[in-house]
Structures are given as C-alpha cells and as structure tokens.
From Swiss-Prot:
Primary gene name: Saysd1
GO biological process: protein quality control for misfolded or incompletely synthesized proteins; rescue of stalled ribosome
Name under which the protein is recorded: SAYSvFN domain-containing protein 1
Disruption of the gene: reported phenotype: No visible phenotype; mice are fertile, with no differences in sperm morphology or motility, although the cauda epididymis contains slightly less sperm.
One annotated GO molecular function: UFM1-modified protein reader activity
Amino acid sequence: MEQRLAEFREARKRASLVAQPSTSSQSVQTSGAKAEPAAATPKTATGWLTRFLKRKANPAIAQAQPNQPQEAGQQLPESTAVPLPSSCRQSFLTNITFLKVLLWLVLLGLFVELEFGLAYFVLSMFYWMYVGTRGPEEKKEGEKSAYSVFNPGCEAIQGTLTAEQLEQELQLRPPQGSRTSPSCSSYP
C-alpha cells in the first residue's frame, strides 16, 4: 500500500511539472490556492480526481452536479479488477438451462407431430443422463472432493486396499518381487 502511495505521489509530481506550462496559458487566477490544484492535475488522472478538479476550477458546475464522496479512500482506483458478482453468473447459467429445456420441449413437440416422439424422448433421456452425470465445469481451486470431505488429508483407511493390492487380489498383476504370476507357473 505504501509503495502504491509513493508511486501515486511521484506520478503526481511528474504530472504537475508537465501541467504547469499549460496552466499558465489558461485564464489568470487570482489566488495561489486555486492555482495549486490545477497545476497538480496529472494527465492520466481519471474519475473522481478529474471531477474534483473541474469543480474546484468552476464553482458553478460544482453546484449543478450532485454531491459525490469527498475522500479519495472511499473510491476504488480504476486499475483494480473487480470480479463479477456470482449472482450474474448464476443467472446466466439459469437462463442457459431454461433455454435448453425449452428447446427440448419444442423439439419433442415436433417429433410427436412426426410420430417419432418416443424415439426422440428415449434418445434425449440418454443425452440428459450424460449431461447430468458430468460436471458443468471443472473442479474449482480449493474445492473439496467428496472423498476428502469425509477423509481430511486423504489418509489410508484401515481395512481398505490400494489399487496395487486390489490388482494382486484379482491376479491381474504379479506380486511385487516375483517375475511370474502364481497362476502362470502351474501351466507347463
């Protein structure tokens, strides 16, 4: 935070040096207090700072515009990224789902008219089962799986087999350390 404040002050100083010649060509101001904010205006200043300095320069405009927050700390800088609210994303997914169901109903009605309604219904049920069994999106960062919810740390549970032990039990793989499987050694 202190680094950003130092960068802002440095940019403001550089901008004030650039802005000083342009302010002298404007109308002559009577007091030094009014000249200081106009000279300190950086060219890259946007948003609340520009509006504030315009109001200071023209008091008539300041009275016509509604009051805005006085402190700079109340507003976010424009360069920071603000994530979209999750309700917007949720409503988008809801709208897509609604449109899919509506399309399915329209196509079902069309195929019923063409006397292929049952075939369309059965095939579409396979599709909906496929869509329902796969996740709508990949697992999010930090999201817990169903296994890790009941077994935090994913520790081995007493009495369960590992994949290697299960393969050995099913005799799909020879036990570790031996080159041939016991079932193969009994055949000549």
